[in-house]
Amino acid sequence: MKVRIGFGLGTRNQLHDGSLITVVEAMEDLGYDSLWVSERVSSGCPDPIVAMSVAAARTTRMKIGMSVMVLPGRNPVLLAKQLATLDRISDGRLLPAFGLGAVDEGEQQAFGVERTTRGALFDETLEVVRKCWADADVHHEGTHFTLRNVRVEPKPVQRFPEVWLGGGSPSELRRVARLGEGWLPSFVTPEQAATGWAELSALAATHGRSIDPEHFGVVIPYALQPLPNATVEALRQRAKGAVDDVVPQSVEHAESLIRRFIDVGASKFVLLPLADPGTADAWVEEMSALATRLLPLQT
């Protein structure tokens, strides 16, 4: 089992200027395995395609992923070309991870998607993206998209980029079982993750599929400063339990939690700050503090 630790920027960051370059370069220099960018139109966080392009140009080793990119509402052909280009520029370092998008009226309006149809649109969009990556001439007759002899170039360096999906609800696990190559849940305890992995493996088998055990990951939200009471209460409702079980609030606690996840079979981790560290220097300081204690866990 190869333990790898990446770092996510989240949706609260304001790294939409040259500070992004400083943070990305420091992340690779510190030894993190991967960078993960998030998406929120109404937030100051940078656009994921642009942020990943910056990272691809300023790094040589670190993998580049999304945690997560909203899929429903995007043109699948253009998205396939954008991501294939990114995979080529980065020499095969792309880690695609997609989601349905925030349950927020403004965000859904921004993507032009109704909540009641976004699940079906997600499935078909991903199907078309994969066809564009793999097929010389793309044919597709679906509910939302029709393509006849459409050629999409370039193709990605990775023959079939492996798609990571998150979530832990029954419907989300069913989607991962049908469509995903990797599972990346968040706000879960090690015990919940282990139960979810067992359920996912059984569901995948019903579709004649299996998920590689090396693709069992977890997003670990953390807070190195005290959280406001309102945030703690919101986290408690989301986590369905004690916040301390899913949100480490010290470097030592983060190490202990990762070790517990490793014990139940997880091996890919994304550290995600719940509070924006602020300046580029503050980001680097926080990443450095975590790296000293956590990156030795990588194998």
Question: Where do the PLM segments sit?
Answer:
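Glycine-enriched alpha-helix->loop->beta-strand junction motifs that scaffold or abut catalytic
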Residues: 31, 58-61, 90, 112, ...
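Active-site mouth loops of central-metabolism enzymes
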Residues: 5-18, 69-77, 157-168, 238-252
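Conserved, mostly hydrophobic/aromatic
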Residues: 27, 31, 55, 86, ...
